[in-house]
């Protein structure tokens, strides 16, 4: 009983120590208000983050494998088995990459050890996007290739101010076109001062000749949290009739970037190897082209630069090139096909490399391959033009 009384007395004493709101000084009241407000804001912030993560995770999906693509403005003629033909691959960088543009996900290191990182999450302005897309589509018009493979074509995207870039390329007179979607993101709030936003993009294939069919296939991608911000990587196989009764198989692709160590790109290359063999065994002429995001000339330091070789790049593994195929890239160019976007473009200072090109079957004769030097006026990539013939003997 004595113990119970003591406990009761202690509790009563503690209660007396607690002051009512009116008994607090103004300073003490302010401290309590600040603490309550801070706690409420912290709770609200945590709740907001949780809701946003649920939004990103629940909104995530991958497009199905083996999707038949729509063909716009199809042509009727087969491509001639005789003479020379051309194909251009061009990553147009969603119209954002003017020479002064840097991208927040790009990082690098200067030769003196100074780290570098890009700034922007969206294009500088809508006018800049329109200028760049008009410029890159103008290059296609100027060179008038028989076929074109275009990467990072945006539509209904925050990062490119909702400019429908498909129109600029599908509207080029004389071309049939297809689009394989490889980016469909939830709204990304990072970087906080210039959020990347909600975006849609794809790989376009253009043809002056009849398209028999075009199909989108899924590439493997990372399975960790990075999948929520990465592209839904894919490639498209487009079949074109040749007037000797055979078929040209054009494989349009865009492999993973920001893949430290190249683990995912290795898986993608292994899948591509299988696909190349299958298309060749069907009797097709085969040309795979696009942005491989891997060095295609076995020289990571070919071009003068004030920067070290970035950690994301590695050379394409020749073991992933099947029999009867070869990499075709411009080894003799004075400029790379891609610049680092961690710093503003300046020739001779910014890191450049050759990651855009082709893998070609041995029943196709390579006449020439050329990086078209645009001085990176409209994109962080230069277009690459392949001139070829069909072997008919």
Go through the PLM ranges and name each one.
Residues 77-87, 99, 198-215, 229-253, ...:
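Beta-strand-turn-beta hairpins that frame and shape the catalytic cleft
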Residues 119-125, 153-155, 219-227, 254-265:
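Surface-exposed cleft-lining segments at the edges of enzyme active sites
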Residues 4-171, 179-190, 194-200:
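N-terminal, active-site-proximal structural segment of metallo-dependent hydrolase catalytic domains
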Residues 98-103, 162-163, 189-193, 218, ...:
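Short aromatic-enriched loop/helix-cap "lid" or pocket-rim segments at secondary-structure transitions
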Residues 20-41, 54-75, 277-287, 294-393:
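Metal-dependent phosphoester-hydrolase catalytic domains
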């Amino acid at each position: 009983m004595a113990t119970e009384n003591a406990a009761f007395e202690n509790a009563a004493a503690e209660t007396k120590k607690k002051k009512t709101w009116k008994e607090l000084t103004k300073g003490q009241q302010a401290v309590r208000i600040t603490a309550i407000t801070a706690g409420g804001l912290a709770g609200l912030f945590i709740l907001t983050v949780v809701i946003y993560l649920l939004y990103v995770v629940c909104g995530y999906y991958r497009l199905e494998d083996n999707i038949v693509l729509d063909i716009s403005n199809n042509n009727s003629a087969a491509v001639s088995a005789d003479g020379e033909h051309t194909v251009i691959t061009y990553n147009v960088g969603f119209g954002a990459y003017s020479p002064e543009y840097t991208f927040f996900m790009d990082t690098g290191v200067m030769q003196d050890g100074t780290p570098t990182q890009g700034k922007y999450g969206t294009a500088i302005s809508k006018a800049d996007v329109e200028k760049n897309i008009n410029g890159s589509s103008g290059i296609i018009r100027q060179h008038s290739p028989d076929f074109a493979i275009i990467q990072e074509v945006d539509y209904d995207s925050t990062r490119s101010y909702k400019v429908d870039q498909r129109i600029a390329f599908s509207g080029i007179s004389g071309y049939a076109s297809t689009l394989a979607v490889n980016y469909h993101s939830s709204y990304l709030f990072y970087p906080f001062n210039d959020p990347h936003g909600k975006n849609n993009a794809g790989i376009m294939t253009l043809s002056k000749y009849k398209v028999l069919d075009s199909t989108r296939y899924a590439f493997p991608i990372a399975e960790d949290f990075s999948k929520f911000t990465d592209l839904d990587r894919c490639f498209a196989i487009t079949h074109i009739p040749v007037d000797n009764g055979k078929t040209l198989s054009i494989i349009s692709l865009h492999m993973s970037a920001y893949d430290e160590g190249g683990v995912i790109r290795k898986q993608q290359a292994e899948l591509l190897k299988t696909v190349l063999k299958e298309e060749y065994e069907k009797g097709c002429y085969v040309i795979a082209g696009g942005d491989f995001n891997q060095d295609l000339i076995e020289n990571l330091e070919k071009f003068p630069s004030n920067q070290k070789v970035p950690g994301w790049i590695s050379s394409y593994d020749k073991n992933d090139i099947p029999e009867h195929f070869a990499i075709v890239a411009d080894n003799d160019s004075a400029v790379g096909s891609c610049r680092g976007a961690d710093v503003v473009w300046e020739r001779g200072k910014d890191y450049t490399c050759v990651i855009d090109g082709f893998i070609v079957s041995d029943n196709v004769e390579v006449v020439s391959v050329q990086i078209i030097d645009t001085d990176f006026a409209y994109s962080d990539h230069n277009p690459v033009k392949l001139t070829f013939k069909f072997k008919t003997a």
